[in-house]
């Protein structure tokens, strides 16, 4: 079957500006959250990615009027109807699990296919289920392809998450906004996207306090009205372009950034010796290789993002000694390593830690196993000698708006082909 590949002829110096898109990890939760509104919602600043289109079509399956126009989405829920959500759309998208919390909150019942997305080893939704049960829901998991969640009544509860989970924190918030009484989430995730979803729900009349801290309190309300809301910029897309600029950029400017959200990466760039200039909502970066070797350990926010450990890896081949990258969040998130070896990389992985030594990369045929691995391979291709061909690029399009066009505009020799 014909498929699209991305091809890159490495060695070009990039310069120019990129406008960072709205946050994928906010958008994929805020779009399901619109079904909690009773009326009309307008979202602005959405990323133009396939995940957004999939979620909009799931809203339409619930008889919601939804109009997606570029970065804007208008939603009218006045004729909403509960329906079982089929598996073919749901399984392509992990964040479809936010439909569970939103539908449980709105209808007290949902039947939904089991979610998919990037294969990153164990990513169970047990903390989500724990939260739903605490609010009074019963879960029927007898089917292998779908899950039925139902509650006679949703009542506020005190919920302690056994592990910090962005998905569970948001999903419990969605289910709890209409619950009677107060819900308290302890050990809640503090990510900016959690705050963004809470701010959106608050804009519709929800009563949520403490988002961005480890304790979130939700007082249930009777009704959520419509709202207009602007999604925050994507800190992972910003971080990825920061890595691209540090690898092969000369005076690359990134606009629409919240500097606080990329502080950990900026600090790591200082250790590496990357030339970074931060002003208000823009960052200017120059390649300043060779870099200093560093150690990186991923942690929950505000620590170093697991989503950036793959994109930063190609930079470490340009360092003056061995670097170590440990992923404490997803210790199996190293499928890019074998692909980088095809390009001549001196890299080994053992028990969740990669050892990365200075290397000269050459073009090769490589396979994007997941979204951020794909970003890593693009950056590797940009600094490699010769032509790199990346297969399975659908993962890349799930998370990066027009990345090929953006890189072309910066001067990269990059194109797509159907093979």
From Swiss-Prot:
Q: Which CDD domains match?
A: UdpNAET (cd01555)
Positions of UDP-N-acetyl-alpha-D-glucosamine binding: 94, 123-127, 307, 329
Task: Identify the InterPro entries for this entry.
Answer: Enolpyruvate_Tfrase_dom, Enolpyruvate_Tfrase_sf, MurA_subfamily, RNA3'P_cycl/enolpyr_Trfase_a/b, UDP_GlcNAc_COvinyl_MurA
Which keywords accompany this UniProt record? Answer: Cell cycle, Cell division, Cell shape, Cell wall biogenesis/degradation, Cytoplasm, Peptidoglycan synthesis, Pyruvate, Transferase
| Keyword Transmembrane helix carried by entry | no
Per UniProt, where does phosphoenolpyruvate bind? 24-25
The EC number of this protein is 2.5.1.7
Database matches in Pfam families: EPSP_synthase
Q: Which residues form the active site?
A: 118 (proton donor)
Which GO molecular function terms does the record list? UDP-N-acetylglucosamine 1-carboxyvinyltransferase activity
GO-annotated biological processes: cell division; cell wall organization; peptidoglycan biosynthetic process; regulation of cell shape; UDP-N-acetylgalactosamine biosynthetic process
Query: PTM 2-(S-cysteinyl)pyruvic acid O-phosphothioketal: at which residues?
Result: 118
Q: Pathway, per Swiss-Prot/TrEMBL?
A: Cell wall biogenesis; peptidoglycan biosynthesis
Instruction: Choose one Gene Ontology CC annotation of this protein and give it.
Output: cytoplasm
Entry's family note: Belongs to the EPSP synthase family. MurA subfamily.
Protein name, UniProt field: UDP-N-acetylglucosamine 1-carboxyvinyltransferase 2
């Amino acid at each position: 079957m014909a498929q699209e590949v991305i091809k890159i002829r490495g060695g070009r110096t990039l310069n120019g500006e990129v406008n960072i898109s709205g946050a994928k990890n906010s958008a994929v939760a805020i779009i399901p959250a619109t079904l909690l509104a009773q009326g009309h919602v307008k979202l602005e600043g959405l990323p133009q990615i396939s995940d957004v289109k999939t979620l909009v079509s799931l809203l339409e399956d619930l008889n919601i009027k939804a109009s997606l126009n570029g970065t804007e989405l208008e939603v009218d829920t006045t004729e909403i109807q509960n329906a079982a959500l089929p598996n073919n759309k749901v399984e392509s998208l992990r964040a479809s699990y936010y439909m569970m919390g939103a539908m449980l909150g709105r209808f007290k019942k949902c039947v939904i296919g089991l979610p998919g997305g990037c294969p990153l080893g164990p990513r169970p939704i047990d903390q989500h289920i724990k939260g739903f049960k605490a609010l009074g829901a019963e879960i029927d998991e007898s089917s292998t392809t779908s899950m039925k969640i139902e509650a006679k009544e949703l009542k506020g509860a005190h919920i302690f998450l056994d592990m910090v989970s962005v998905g569970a924190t948001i999903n419990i918030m969605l289910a709890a906004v209409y619950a009677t009484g107060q819900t308290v989430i302890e050990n809640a995730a503090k990510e900016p996207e959690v705050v963004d979803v809470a701010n959106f729900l608050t804009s519709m009349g929800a009563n949520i306090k403490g988002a961005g801290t480890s304790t979130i309190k939700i007082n249930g309300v009777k009704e959520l009205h419509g709202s207009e809301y602007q999604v925050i910029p994507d800190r992972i897309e910003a971080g990825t372009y920061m890595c691209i600029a540090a690898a092969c950029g000369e005076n690359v400017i990134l606009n629409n950034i919240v500097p606080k959200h990329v502080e950990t990466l900026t600090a790591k760039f200082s250790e590496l010796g990357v030339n970074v200039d931060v002003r208000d909502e823009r960052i200017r970066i120059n390649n300043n290789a060779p870099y200093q070797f560093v150690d990186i350990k991923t942690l929950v926010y505000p620590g170093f993002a697991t989503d950036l450990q793959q994109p930063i890896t190609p930079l470490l081949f340009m360092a003056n000694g061995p670097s170590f990258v440990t992923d404490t969040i997803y210790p199996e998130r190293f499928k890019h390593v074998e692909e980088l070896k095809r390009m001549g990389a001196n890299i080994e992985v053992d028990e969740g830690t990669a050892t990365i030594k200075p290397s000269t990369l050459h073009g090769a045929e490589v396979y994007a196993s997941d979204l951020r691995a794909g970003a890593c391979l693009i950056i590797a291709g940009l600094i490699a000698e010769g032509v790199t061909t990346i297969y399975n690029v659908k993962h890349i399009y799930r998370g990066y708006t027009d990345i090929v066009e953006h890189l072309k505009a910066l001067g990269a020799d990059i194109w797509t082909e159907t093979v």
